[in-house]
A protein has these predicted regions:
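Helix-start/capping segments and mature chain N-termini
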Residues: 1-127
Length: 127
């Protein structure tokens, strides 16, 4: 079991968090529907970008539980992807951004660099 069962990954460009309204909405949905509590946290208030990450493209990973969170900042490292494979999976529970990605990782194979997951007819994620 993970200390923080859910996470968000927020792009930071030149010190400014991107798409915070989208991340806030998904965070609030998770708080209400996964943890069964009303959200109190405003991402715009807690995502404070450290001085060493004010330039360029940075990723902010927010791992969270019902009452605690942890922020990690790191430079964005683009991957070289040559081949993609779509995998159609309806049985995976993917209502939230789970920290435990073992079900998604199990979909990877040696035939492609990246797997694109199609869940209930919609592209939902990649590994």
């Amino acid at each position: 079991m993970f200390l923080f069962p859910l996470f968000e990954t927020i792009a930071i460009i030149d010190g400014k968090p991107q798409n915070l309204a989208y991340h806030q909405a998904r965070f609030e949905h998770a708080m209400r529907n996964y943890f069964q509590i009303e959200p109190k946290l405003q991402l715009a208030e807690v995502v404070q970008v450290p001085a060493e990450h004010q330039q360029g493209l940075v990723r902010c990973r927010m791992d969270y539980s019902a009452h605690h969170f942890e922020l990690t900042f790191f430079p964005y490292q683009p991957r070289q992807i040559q081949t993609l494979q779509c995998v159609y999976v309806d049985e995976i529970d993917y209502r939230f951004k789970y920290s435990d990605r073992s079900q998604l990782e199990a979909l990877k194979n040696d035939q492609s660099d990246e797997v694109v997951i199609v869940h209930q007819g919609y592209v939902s994620d990649c590994t």
